[in-house]
C-alpha cells in the first residue's frame, strides 16, 4: 500500500476530513494487497461493505509530458529542465520563488510551504541544473504566469564557494588585511599574501528528486516508492472479491 500514513506529521491519511459515505480508502498496487490491508483495519463503526476500483491515483500521469515554454498556457502541467538564474526568495508565509532558464525563456517557479519542499527550494543557487514538474498558474494583476512545483529533481549542483582571508600554515591562523588593495599579512610571522582564498562550501541538498510530504500529495502525485516502478496492469477477475457486502 502507499500514502496511508504520514509518519512525519503522525497523521492518518486513510479517512476523509469531512462527513462522507466513504469511511476509509486504502491505496495499493493490486487487489490482493488491498483486501489483506482492509482486513487489518478494525473499525468500531458497522460498515456496509467495500469496493475495489482502478484509478490513476499516484501515477504522475499529469507530469509525463514536457511543457512547451513557447506556449506556456495556464492550467496545463508537465515537466521542464532548466538552470536556476535567480536566487530563491522566501515570503513571509514561507513560500519560495525562483526562476530558471529553459531554451532562453525565463520561467518563474513557486514552491508553497504546505508541500514541505521549501527547505530544498530555498537552498538552490544560481547555476543549479534542475528538472521540475507542476502546473501553470494563470497570471494575476500582481503576478505573472508561474509554474507551481510538485517536485524538484536536482540533476547537477553548482559549486558553492566564498572568499576568505588567506591561511598561514606556519601559524595555523588566518591572515589579516593590511588595507584596501594592500594584501594580507600574518600578525605573528609576518608572512604575506596578495589575494583571498576561495573556500568551497558543502551543499545541504543533493542530486536527487524531492517530492512533497505524503499529506501534501495531490491525487496524481507519484509516491517515492513508485518512482522506479513500471506501469502494472491487473485484469479484472469476476471471481475475485472486488465488491463485497458485509
State where each predicted segment sits.
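OB-fold and OB-like single-stranded nucleic-acid-recognition modules
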Residues: 1-246
Amino acid at each position: 500500500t502507499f500514502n496511508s500514513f504520514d509518519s512525519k506529521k503522525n497523521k492518518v491519511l486513510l479517512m476523509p476530513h469531512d462527513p462522507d459515505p466513504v469511511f476509509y480508502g486504502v491505496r495499493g498496487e493490486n487487489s490482493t494487497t488491498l483486501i489483506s490491508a482492509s482486513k487489518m483495519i478494525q473499525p468500531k463503526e458497522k460498515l456496509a461493505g467495500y469496493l475495489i476500483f482502478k484509478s490513476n491515483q499516484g501515477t504522475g500521469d499529469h507530469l509525463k509530458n514536457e511543457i512547451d515554454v513557447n506556449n506556456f498556457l495556464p492550467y496545463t502541467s508537465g515537466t521542464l529542465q532548466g538552470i536556476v538564474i535567480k536566487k530563491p526568495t522566501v515570503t513571509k508565509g514561507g513560500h519560495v520563488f525562483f526562476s530558471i532558464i529553459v531554451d532562453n525563456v525565463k520561467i518563474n517557479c513557486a514552491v508553497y510551504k504546505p508541500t514541505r519542499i521549501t527547505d530544498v527550494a530555498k537552498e538552490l543557487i544560481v547555476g543549479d541544473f534542475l528538472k521540475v514538474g507542476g502546473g501553470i498558474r494563470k497570471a494575476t494583476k500582481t503576478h505573472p504566469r508561474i509554474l507551481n512545483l510538485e517536485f524538484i529533481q536536482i540533476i547537477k549542483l553548482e559549486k558553492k564557494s566564498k572568499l576568505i582571508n588567506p591561511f598561514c600554515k606556519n601559524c595555523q591562523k588566518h591572515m589579516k588585511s593590511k588595507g584596501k588593495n594592500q594584501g594580507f599579512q600574518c600578525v605573528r610571522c609576518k608572512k604575506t599574501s596578495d589575494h583571498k582564498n576561495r573556500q568551497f562550501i558543502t551543499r545541504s541538498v543533493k542530486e536527487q528528486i524531492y517530492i512533497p510530504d505524503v499529506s501534501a500529495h495531490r491525487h496524481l502525485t507519484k509516491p517515492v516508492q513508485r518512482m522506479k516502478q513500471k506501469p502494472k496492469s491487473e485484469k479484472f477477475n469476476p471471481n475475485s472479491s472486488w465488491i463485497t457486502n458485509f
